[in-house]
Structures are given as C-alpha cells and as structure tokens.
Design a protein with these regions (language model features):
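Conserved AMP-binding loop of ANL adenylate-forming enzymes
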Residues: 67-109, 162
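A broad, structure-centric signal for solvent-exposed, well-ordered loop/edge residues
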Residues: 16-22, 27, 91, 112, ...
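Nucleotide 5′-phosphate-binding alpha/beta core
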Residues: 1-41, 47-79, 87, 124-131, ...
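Short, charge-rich amphipathic segments
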Residues: 46-58, 98-111
C-alpha cells in the first residue's frame, strides 16, 4: 500500500530484462494460471526482447491509459493516426491496426527520397496524430519547412516516444507540422510511465505504477522514490 511501498522498493535489487529472461519462471506469479493470461512481447529496442504475461484486467487497464492520456493530446478513439516505429519483433496484427485506424510506417534509411515518401504517406493517411521518435519527427519537420510546408497535414498533435525530446526538436516539430508536441514515456511490459500535458509538464502514472527514481548506472537503489 501507499505506506509500505517505498520501503519495499528500497529493499528490492535492481534487475534487467536479461535476468528476467534467464529466470523467467521465477518471476511468474503462482496466483494466476498461465493459460488464462495474455502473452505480450517487447519490441527489443533495448537489445533484449522477451515475452511476458499479464492478466486481462491489466491489459484492459493499459488500453484505458492509452485512451486517457490520448485525450490530453487531442486524440479520440478511432481517429486515424500514424505510428513511426521500427518493427523489431511481433508487429501489431493487421486486424488490430484496422480496428484502431492506425498506420504503422517504418523509418529506415531516411535519405531525402525516404523522407519524402514518408511525408507523402503521412499526408495521404489523413492522420490527426503523429507518433514517433523525436529525432525522426524533427527530421521530417525540417524537410517540410525546407519545402515550405506545401502539403496539407490536418495534424492535431505529435507524440514523442522512445527518446528524450530536446527543446530544439520540440520547436522544429511544432513549426513543421503546425501542432503541439507531447512526450510519452511507455514500456510495453508495464504500460505508461509518464505523459506530457498541455502545459508541457510530465505527469507520473501513479494511478497504475510505483515508480522508483535511480541514479544512472548506479547499481544501487535510490534514497528517494516517487
């Protein structure tokens, strides 16, 4: 509970995905039948892809978080949106993308030809929200600014994922696509960790997670938790 969780977190060792993968069965709760759980997969962006399980209540909660935080950006369920991401492993099924009105585009190469092709497909999608790595979004935005932003983009918001959103990149993306930019910190296996609001302040997802702040590469638990 809220009184004891900080003390409990402080006693837990720091682990990584490789350790979980190597000793997977030790981490599976005996309170749930494996057959009744939903299997998920990380995309391998940290170099250690692995499968994990959640119960249906947890899966539905993550979906609810997507809708809740999406409203902060102006997105409404069912509206067309483009997701710029690398497809490391287990891409979302086609039927799921169709139901969500989602277009997934893979940003590879990113020479002038590839950038123009991506911009063309984004414009053709009529998406109201654009999701992607800030470095890629900024690259596309600069290309649009160089071209005078002639193509019509009915963009309502852009969402930065997977990397730190630097102030210069935020400004470039906002100018290039003519919409506000929001930061999203999310992990496939735990859901939403933090999300930007319209005042550009990050809010921790304390409704679903206990979040411990650790010194980088310290190997020890932090003195403070959030």
């Amino acid at each position: 509970d809220a009184q004891t969780a900080p003390d409990v977190l402080g006693r837990l060792p720091i682990i990584d995905k490789r350790l979980i993968k190597d000793r997977f069965n030790d981490f599976v709760s005996a309170a749930f039948r494996r057959a009744a759980l939903v299997e998920g997969h990380t995309n391998g962006s940290t170099g250690a892809p692995f499968a994990f399980y959640m119960n249906r209540r947890r899966r539905d909660r993550v979906r609810a978080e997507t809708l809740f935080f999406g409203r902060w950006t102006g997105y409404r369920i069912g509206e067309p949106h483009v997701f710029l991401r690398l497809l490391f492993w287990h891409p979302k099924p086609v039927i799921a993308r169709l139901l969500e009105n989602q277009v997934i585009l893979e940003p590879r190469g990113l020479g002038s030809v590839e950038i123009d092709r991506l911009l063309h497909r984004i414009g053709r999608s009529k998406a109201v929200t654009l999701i992607g790595y800030p470095s890629v979004l900024a690259l596309l935005a600069r290309r649009r600014l160089e071209a005078g932003g002639s193509a019509s983009f009915p963009m309502r918001s852009a969402i930065s994922i997977g990397e730190i959103l630097l102030p210069g990149a935020r400004e470039t993306i906002e100018r290039g696509f003519g919409c506000p930019v929001f930061e999203r910190y999310r992990a496939t296996e735990v859901g939403y960790i933090a999300h930007d609001c319209q005042d550009h302040r990050l809010h921790l997802n304390v409704g679903s997670l206990w979040i411990e702040l650790l010194p980088p590469e310290s190997g020890t638990t932090a003195a403070e938790t959030a």
